[in-house]
Amino acid sequence: MIKERTFLAIKPDGVQRGYIAEIIGRFEKKGFKLVGLKQLIPSKQLAQDHYGVHRERPFFKDLVNFISSGPVVAMIWEGEGVILSARKIIGATKPLEAEPGTIRGDLAIDIGRNIIHGSDGEETAKFEINLWFDQHEICDWETSDSEWRVES
């Protein structure tokens, strides 16, 4: 049985500032399972496809340029309620509105440099996972403590 999955990406500012381990640790501690992980410098085309919903917005070009300016850590996380939980762990898009204890509330200041991207729903997650990962890059595995994470 496939559990809920979401796509997360540590943006170039998060990578440059050395937050990869801290961010991954927050999701591991919550009990989610990492099933896809890679670091890459996204092409402009990948960035445009990823943020296509914002194509007509005035910030689109700057967003594409930023995301493709340096390394991004792309991840697929799996677990019960992972999409909503990830959104809560990440915090509000505008870091100054993000609650303390969230990634953006603790680590980010500016909306244009808000450290991390997370899928906002099930359909978006499926689209983003398929955009960033080939099927052979996804590891379907079971944790040895899965029975202790959620009630059956």
From Swiss-Prot:
CDD domains: NDPk_I (cd04413). Keywords: ATP-binding, Cytoplasm, Kinase, Magnesium, Metal-binding, Nucleotide metabolism, Nucleotide-binding, Phosphoprotein, Transferase. GO terms for biological process: CTP biosynthetic process; GTP biosynthetic process; UTP biosynthetic process. GO terms for molecular function: ATP binding; metal ion binding; nucleoside diphosphate kinase activity. It comes from the Bacteria. The active site is at residue 117. The keyword Cell wall biogenesis/degradation does not apply. ATP binds at residues 11, 59, 87, 93, 104, 114. It holds the Pfam family NDK. Its EC number is 2.7.4.6. Belongs to the NDK family. Homotetramer. This is Nucleoside diphosphate kinase. It comes from Prochlorococcus marinus (strain MIT 9515).
